[in-house]
From Swiss-Prot:
Riboflavin transporter localized at the inner mitochondrial membrane of the spermatozoa midpiece, which is required for male fertility. SLC22A14-mediated riboflavin transport is essential for spermatozoa energy generation and motility: riboflavin is the precursor of FMN and FAD, which are coenzymes of many enzymes in the TCA cycle (the citric acid cycle) in mitochondria. Required for sperm motility and normal sperm flagellar structure. Residues 7-16 have a biased composition (Polar residues). The gene is Slc22a14. Residues 1-21 are annotated as: Disordered. Keywords: Cell membrane, Cell projection, Cilium, Flagellum, Glycoprotein, Membrane, Mitochondrion, Mitochondrion inner membrane, Transmembrane, Transmembrane helix, Transport. Testis-specific (at protein level). Specifically expressed in male germ cells (at protein level). It is a multi-pass membrane protein. Its main location: mitochondrion. One of its GO terms (biological process) is sperm capacitation. This is Solute carrier family 22 member 14. One of its GO terms (molecular function) is riboflavin transmembrane transporter activity. It comes from Mus musculus (Mouse).
């Protein structure tokens, strides 16, 4: 009896400890369960995706995929020379009126003597930049003895005696009332982004990814390299408009091509690395612009590598997913067999025959489907609102940083150095938290930094600059994550068109940021940043998680992919549990494990109360293989 009491006491204390331990670890078990369900959903989706099966046979990331990713990285690096070069081509110069008329009466005058005799001085003793003494028909001795008294604006142009570089400013004399309007230059660039995103996005879905990538590279070659030969500032703006079109066209089509060739987490890793190399390109551009003294030479150096790149572009292949949705199944088989040959793999014949079945129905879609398809409309509306807020925050932070008057080379270098690790950290975030939670985490960090900026004192400025850098660190990760998220949410048949449409929201956010920041110098723009962060968090919660699931090819969506979270709670867990867990429970190593019951609460109007019991598994998720039914 005493032993029974001791046993009951020990069992009771052990049960109490187990209950206490379970209560403490319940959140982590819920989080692990969520990760498990997400991975099982990806496994279930890949089991039904014939293209994913073919890619498994080819090799998920073999030599062909490496070559594809590298060939898309290189233009991303070079594109920075055309996108961000205006920061260094419009550096401020100190102009003085050209007074070479005095050399006719005093040809042996030095430059300092010439300026001293012909230019008026400011109260602080420096020469005035936009005024000169009126020329007089005197000899040199009379000018030195009596001096000149009457001034006028510069009549014979300007000189730049203290300029160390040759820029657009001193090339086209954009000084003394002829200064370029920065807002106009930004408007030209954003207009190019706007038209290019719509045009190239539409053409990419109609003609294919490969021809539009080739067209974008030709645009870099003609208008980027050709910028070095412009003869006026208006020609420069004209060329910059088409450079913006080529830039956004290449960004949309290259991401679509890479994501449609890769599967699983390789998609996210490739896009993040592409963005990281884009940032590395800015670092290279900054260092080169600091050393190269002539702006035309800088444009030539940035455009020359495009020539050999165009010659090697034939190595790329069209997206097989796009070929399949367009009904070009035989061409899709050819490019898949070519990829398998490069990877030294063999595709089973039965897998290729299965592609024939999916290719009999040609997916038909148009831009009107973004309005007529309810699910697609909700998704595009939500991600468009997030893109607007993200663009507004990004541009406002950049304008706030530029407002401190720091050296442009220092600012661009520090921004780029900060952005590279921020983007690389996103690989880990996406692996462990998924798209939605990783996006929410980075947006929360941006919100925190904006709140700090809102309440920080204006002095010392070093504290504000540090906070701005931390905010830009978080924003760099947000942009990469959400770009991947957006591309995965859109179907293959309208992926490029959808990316082009959400670019409208990005342009609208940029214009709003510039307009608000220009009108006020208070903390109002930062307050709007905080508000935009909250709105972005709200809208991002409306879109479904994509994780490592297979890309969608058509606009036909399942009910379980509804955008409403409450509907997902009803459908997704039950579907995944019924289809995937039945095979896992059958494993002999799992049948003896403890069961953890997780109950999903139904809505008030539900007819049945559903309870999902998920086995607690000691095996890693990667070792579980679902058997086909």
């Amino acid at each position: 009896m005493k032993e029974d009491q001791n046993y009951k006491t020990a069992f009771g204390s052990q049960n109490s400890r187990d209950t206490h331990r379970h209560e403490i670890s319940f959140p982590s078990q819920n989080w692990s369960l969520e990760m498990l369900l997400r991975r099982l959903k990806a496994i279930d989706a890949r089991r039904d995706d014939k293209f994913a099966s073919v890619m498994d046979a080819i090799g998920e990331f073999g030599t062909f995929q490496w070559r594809l990713v590298v060939l898309t990285f290189i233009p991303s690096i070079l594109s920075t020379f055309f996108i961000f070069s205006h920061h260094f081509l419009l550096t401020a110069q100190r102009p003085y009126c050209n007074t070479s008329w005095i050399l006719e009466v005093g040809p042996n005058l030095t430059e300092d003597e010439q300026l001293n005799l012909t230019l008026p001085r400011a109260p602080n003793g420096s020469f005035l930049t936009c005024l000169m003494y009126i020329p007089v028909p005197w000899d040199l001795d009379s000018i030195i003895h009596f001096g000149l008294n009457y001034t006028e604006t510069c009549k014979f142009g300007w000189i730049y005696p203290f300029a160390h570089t040759r820029s657009l400013i001193n090339e086209f004399d954009l000084v003394c009332g002829n200064e370029p309007n920065k807002e106009n230059g930004l408007t030209v660039f954003l207009s190019g982004v706007l038209t290019g995103s719509l045009l190239f996005g539409f053409l990419s879905d109609k003609l294919g990814r490969y021809p539009i990538i080739l067209l974008s590279l030709l645009g870099f070659l003609i208008f980027g390299f050709g910028t070095a030969f412009v003869s006026s500032f208006y020609q420069y703006l004209f060329f910059r408009f088409f450079v913006a079109q080529a830039s956004v066209g290449y960004a949309i089509c290259s991401v679509s091509l890479v994501m449609e060739w890769l599967v699983g987490e390789h998609r996210a890793q490739a896009v993040i690395l592409q963005h990281s190399f884009l940032t590395i390109g800015v670092i290279l551009l900054t260092g080169l612009a600091y050393k190269v003294v002539h702006w035309r030479l800088l444009c030539l150096l940035g455009g020359m590598p495009m020539f050999p790149l165009i010659c090697n572009i034939w190595v790329l292949r069209e997206s097989p997913r796009w070929l399949m949705v367009r009904g070009k199944v035989e061409e899709a088989k050819k490019v898949l067999c070519y990829a398998a040959e490069v990877n030294k793999k063999t595709i089973p014949l039965n897998l290729l025959n299965e592609l024939q079945i999916s290719g009999k129905k040609v997916a038909k879609a148009s831009i009107l489907d973004f309005c007529t398809n309810q699910h697609l409309f909700k998704v595009v509306l939500a991600i468009g609102c997030v893109w607007f807020t993200v663009s507004y925050i990004s541009f406002t932070l950049n304008l706030k940083m530029n407002d401190f008057g720091l050296d442009v080379y220092f600012v661009q270098m520090v921004r780029s150095i900060v952005a590279v690790p921020a983007r690389l950290c996103c690989i880990i975030l996406l692996e462990y938290f998924g798209r939605k939670w990783a996006l929410n985490l980075t947006l929360f960090l941006v919100t925190s930094m904006c709140l700090f900026l809102l309440f920080l004192p204006q002095e010392p400025k070093s504290t504000i600059i540090l906070t701005l850098m931390l905010a830009e660190f978080s924003m760099a990760g947000t942009l990469s994550i959400f770009f991947i998220y957006t591309a995965e949410l859109l179907p293959t048949v309208l992926r490029s068109t959808g990316l082009g449409m959400v670019s409208l929201a990005w342009v609208a956010g940029a214009i709003s940021s510039v307009a608000i920041f220009k009108q006020t110098k208070t903390q109002l723009p930062i307050f709007f940043c905080c508000l935009c962060c909250v709105l972005a968090l709200c809208f991002s919660s409306l879109v479904p998680e994509t994780g490592s699931q297979s890309l969608r090819d058509s606009i036909e969506y399942n009910i379980r992919d509804s955008i409403e979270p409450k509907d997902r709670n009803k459908d997704v867990p039950m579907v995944i549990a019924e289809e995937s867990m039945s095979d896992i429970v059958a494993d002999s190593e799992v049948t003896n494990t403890t069961l953890n019951a997780v109950t999903f609460k139904p809505e008030e109007n539900s007819l049945l109360n559903m309870t999902l019991e998920v086995p607690k598994m000691d095996l890693p998720v990667q070792s579980l293989k679902a058997q086909p039914p």
